[in-house]
Amino acid sequence: MAYVKLSEKALKHNLETVSKKAGGSDKIAAVLKDNAYGHGIEGFAKKISRLGIKKAVVRTYEEALKIADFFPYILILSDTPRHDSFHYAINDLDTLQVLEPGTKVHLKIDTGMHRNGIALEEIEKAFELLQKNRAHLTGVFTHFRSADELSSELFWQNEQWQTVKQHVIELIKKYNLQKPLFHAANSAALFRLGCEDDFARIGIALYGYTELDDLYEPPALEPVASLWAQKIASRELKKGSRVGYGGVFEAREDMIISTYDAGYADGIFRFQKEIEDGKILGRVSMDSILLEGEKKEICIFSDAKKMARKLGTISYELLVKMPAHLSRTWID
């Protein structure tokens, strides 16, 4: 069956790189949402917790439950807040009005992305609702919209963020609250700005990538995951024979072809014409592709960024397309 290889050596290298930039592994929260960017959330969580990471960020409550044994501090970005051991991101005032007493919350502040988050002029109202419902403010954060782009917008938005922090500090004094944890930097922002907050939320860099322009001199990270497929069968295809759905590929000469057990249900795009190990013959099927030759296994990609550029997308999309049903094998 198709499977994913994961390099522990690459993971250690990436973690050392981001830890050095952040000022220590204690200032890193590993972003493990969406099945750890396709790497397999439980296995990846186990590895990275053993390497010293204490904080994790996930998308849902279900993801948090899967890794609860590995991290003492877990932030959930997109789920209904509960009064339990997890911390929950709050994006609007409506959610604050229905919190259970004791719920641990991180207020997300909209500093310019305008996707979600509490508006700057709503911050004090948010504090009033926190007090009213006796929720626990444990964090305040934002998200940068252009950290990996060749522009100065990151600096403008970071100025907004500094203003937010000052306002929050004034409000915690007013309401006699403990100082929350501040966090804003993602992978790209960490390498451009460093980390002056309590921690940075690091996702894509742990997996071996940034989308930073070369002018920013991005760090030398190593891809953790590679996607592989195994041979199902080989056959001789005669000159003039056509193969696959629609018969869109026609052999120009006699050739040996092989079927491999990865298709568009396994992380390959249906429109894809080639993989790292060669050209795809005909159309991609749901569960298989055809290549010339008879290798026992083939590499779909070992560098998601390089492959993504050929496909007109970004490394993130290729990685999260690796489905959960694929087995994941750690090497090194």
Swiss-Prot record:
Residues at the catalytic site: 33 (proton acceptor), 245 (proton acceptor)
Enzyme class: isomerase
Record key words, sorted: Isomerase, Pyridoxal phosphate
Annotated EC: 5.1.1.1
GO biological process, one term: peptidoglycan biosynthetic process
Molecular function GO terms recorded: alanine racemase activity; pyridoxal phosphate binding
This protein's pathway: Amino-acid biosynthesis; D-alanine biosynthesis; D-alanine from L-alanine: step 1/1
SUPFAM superfamilies: Alanine racemase C-terminal domain-like, PLP-binding barrel
UniProt xrefs under Pfam families: Ala_racemase_C, Ala_racemase_N
Binding positions (substrate): 115, 286
GO CC list: cytosol
Cofactor: pyridoxal 5'-phosphate
Record-linked InterPro entries: Ala_racemase, Ala_racemase/Decarboxylase_C, Ala_racemase_C, Ala_racemase_N, Ala_racemase_pyridoxalP-BS, PLP-binding_barrel
Modified residues (N6-(pyridoxal phosphate)lysine): 33
Catalytic reactions on record: L-alanine = D-alanine
Function: Catalyzes the interconversion of L-alanine and D-alanine. May also act on other amino acids.
Homology family: Belongs to the alanine racemase family.
Stated name of the protein: Alanine racemase
